[in-house]
């Protein structure tokens, strides 16, 4: 399974602690899936790239959106696990442009996912979703990283 973390907008050549932390979590995902950060200039670039990612199965786009559905870590893991078990090859988690996703992009998404009611800086949102992706894989693998709250 290939799970890139995409974002709209360029950070240029600068790196910061949030980029490093995002990369750390994506690297931790390596035993479970191929994960990396991917930047796109605009939404059209993301959808064009997604169109080229078709394989045996259609690429699945998950857009982080404040109007999306908020789910628990366990529910997110179950969603990822279901896609994995169905043989989905590509799940793209995408943090949108500064002014939010266009209505067209929102319609094309397989899932609109909210990280909660608070607004987050995009770099921080990337860290949070990268950590949640790693957590999801560890939940599915029965790894002790996630202890949960019952």
Label every PLM stretch briefly.
Residues 28-92:
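S-adenosyl-L-methionine/SAH cofactor-binding core of RNA-modifying enzymes
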């Amino acid at each position: 399974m290939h799970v890139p973390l995409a974002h709209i907008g360029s950070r240029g050549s600068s790196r910061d602690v949030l980029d490093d932390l995002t990369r750390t979590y994506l690297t931790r995902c390596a035993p479970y899936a191929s994960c990396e950060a991917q930047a796109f200039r605009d939404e059209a670039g993301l959808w064009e790239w997604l169109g080229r990612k078709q394989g045996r199965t259609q690429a699945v786009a998950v857009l982080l959106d404040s109007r999306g559905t908020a789910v628990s870590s366990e529910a997110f893991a179950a969603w990822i696990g279901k896609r994995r078990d169905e043989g989905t090859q590509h799940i793209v988690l995408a943090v949108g442009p500064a002014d939010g996703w266009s209505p067209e992009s929102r319609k094309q998404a397989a899932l609109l996912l909210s990280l909660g009611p608070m607004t987050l800086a995009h770099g921080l949102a990337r860290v949070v979703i990268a950590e949640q992706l790693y957590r999801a894989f560890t939940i599915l693998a029965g790894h002790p990283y996630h202890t949960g709250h019952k």
